[in-house]
Amino acid sequence: MKQIFASFFAVLFGAFLAQAADDHITYEGKEGPGKGKHIVLLSGDEEYRSEEGLPMLAKILSQRHGFKCTVLFSLNDKGEIDPTNQKSLSHPQALDSADAIIMLLRFRTWPDEVYKHFDDACNRGIPVIGLRTSTHAFRGKIGGFGKRVLGEGWVSHWGGHKREACRGVIEKGAEKNPILNGVTDVFADSDVYEAYPPADAKILMR
């Protein structure tokens, strides 16, 4: 009976701790090459469920590779995760200690005080990995963040949006690139974006 009560209390206490910072999630890093480094993952898109996928990625990076990972979300006025609120990013202060940023954002219009945390992090020269809609992470002029930082903004959908799938093929000569370690040709039930990468871009997959 004591063991059952102890187990129940542990689960209840763990749930309480998770709710104590319910505007963001932090996974402490275990042992691995990323030990001592902090990755901040920014979710905020209306189509690709970054609020679900990025916590999964953060857990993998923390448990298998040792990185401390913090996931930030778009919230509504009730404090609930709401990717349609383009003006919100929870706990932006986490960016102040970021060693890298992974982002899946779309058309965000954050307040200036939130932008400042992001700008300061980028201006430190830390790596930024942009996924899918991050080419148009922020609503603004053509040639903005996507083009200047990631190498391309939004151009068009290649294939029928929400109707066709795609196949990704590893670029010839890129097979041994460490980024592709363990990766083979891929298939996705989604169309892709048309892009015109910079002349000095290294293409790993088409």
What are these regions (language model features)?
Residues K35-G36, L131-R206:
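An acidic, glycine-rich "communication" segment
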Residues A20-A98:
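Aromatic-Pro/Gly-enriched surface loop or interdomain linker
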Residues H38-G44, A94-G140:
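Short alpha-beta junction capping motif
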Residues E31-K35, Q93-S97, A121-R124, K172, ...:
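Extracellular/periplasmic catalytic domains that process cell-envelope and extracellular macromolecules
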Residues A6-F16:
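Bacterial N-terminal signal peptides
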